């Protein structure tokens, strides 16, 4: 009987729950923007509007930093297949973004790029972990007991290391919990180190068209190589529509701009209008260089 608030995204979540309960034809959420974009305009000023997305794509984007929509808000609409529309409060006549079960095939494999900043990369390393069952279970059990949410997981096939990202603010608690859990292994050299790397971020490439697309990973990492960007850790699910990379946080703008240029074209306008107020020596020299 207690009254509680639902937190961030609570009003959207309420709307989609009601939409599902009432078997609505559609649910429309009004925002201060036109809809979901191919990238955060803070990094890519002329990012493109996304006309439509699948539920899975929208959930991935919202989880990995697209704050316009909370991932929880989509859940009630998936089973009844009710479409969700995101529209601008001030321009409701604009089409916005449609999120639904049936999405027309895009000519581009990637739908959008997104990033989560303020992360810390926690790693548990040691040759004594190889072939020992239960290490991953104990690792994430320790996180669960401290109510620490994990945003990305990457593990070496040799089982000699496992790393994952959490909020930077949870870093000290996570390290303390893990060192307590693996106290015996640390003392006996079975686990060599448990450490946390500060100031990292996750950049995610999302799109249903990525599934089965040959050479896409090479395209991503080739673009990073050209931009001299280093990848600290990588994660990709079996669904194949998300490639997530951990990088240094200060490199996020360059990483997003690089990938947006790679998959969506140049962000530089083809035409620039220039007005010269006067035609002195400086103006004459400038026109000769154009």
Regions found by a protein language model. Give the residues of each.
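Glycine-rich adenosine-cofactor-binding loop
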Residues: 272-290
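C-terminal catalytic "cap/lid" subdomain
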Residues: 1-270
């Amino acid at each position: 009987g207690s009254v509680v608030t639902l937190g961030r995204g609570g009003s959207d979540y309420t709307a989609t729950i009601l939409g599902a309960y009432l078997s609505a034809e559609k649910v429309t959420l009004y925002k201060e923007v036109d809809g979901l974009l191919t990238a955060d305009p803070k990094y890519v000023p002329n990012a493109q509007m996304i006309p439509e997305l699948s539920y899975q794509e929208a959930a991935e984007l919202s989880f990995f930093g697209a704050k316009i929509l909370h991932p929880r808000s989509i859940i009630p609409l998936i089973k009844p297949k009710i479409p969700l529309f995101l529209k601008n409060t001030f321009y409701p006549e604009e089409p916005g973004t449609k999120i639904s079960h049936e999405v027309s095939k895009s000519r581009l494999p990637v739908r959008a790029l997104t990033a989560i900043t303020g992360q810390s990369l926690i790693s548990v390393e040691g040759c004594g972990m190889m072939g020992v069952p239960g290490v991953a279970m104990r690792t994430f059990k320790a996180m669960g007991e401290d109510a620490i949410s994990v945003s990305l997981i990457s593990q070496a096939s040799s089982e000699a290391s496992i790393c994952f990202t959490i909020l930077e603010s949870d870093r000290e608690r996570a390290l303390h919990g893990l060192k307590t859990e693996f106290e015996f292994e640390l003392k006996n050299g079975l686990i060599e180190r448990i450490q946390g790397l500060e100031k990292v971020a996750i950049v995610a490439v999302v799109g249903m068209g990525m599934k089965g697309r040959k050479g896409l990973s090479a395209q991503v990492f080739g673009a990073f190589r050209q931009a001299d960007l280093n990848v600290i850790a990588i994660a990709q699910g079996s669904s194949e529509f998300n490639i997530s990379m951990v990088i240094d946080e200060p490199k996020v703008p360059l990483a997003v701009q690089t990938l947006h240029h790679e998959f969506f074209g140049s962000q530089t306008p083809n035409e620039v209008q220039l007005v010269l107020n006067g035609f002195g020596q400086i103006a004459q020299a400038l026109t000769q260089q154009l």
